[in-house]
């Protein structure tokens, strides 16, 4: 009998990651210690509103781009 893996592959800024957990965008950003007030998130080629982050679950082959806002002078 062959065991089927339930691991999901997803990409953050082009870097490949794996998870076997069910996780939403909000929790994923917390896991990676991103300051959510200073970033823009693109999820599968669409800009994602912060109010939806807790509703969107990571799926296999999702592509997430995170752009952080940096101030300076």
Curated annotation (Swiss-Prot):
Keywords: Chloroplast, Plastid
Protein name: Uncharacterized protein ycf40
GO cellular component, one term: chloroplast
Pfam families tied to this protein: ThiS
InterPro entries: Beta-grasp_dom_sf (IPR012675), Mopterin_synth/thiamin_S_b (IPR016155), Thi_S (IPR010035), ThiS/MoaD-like (IPR003749)
Assigned protein family: Belongs to the ycf40 family.
Main location group: plastid
Compartments where found: Plastid, Chloroplast
Top-level taxon in the UniProt lineage: Eukaryota
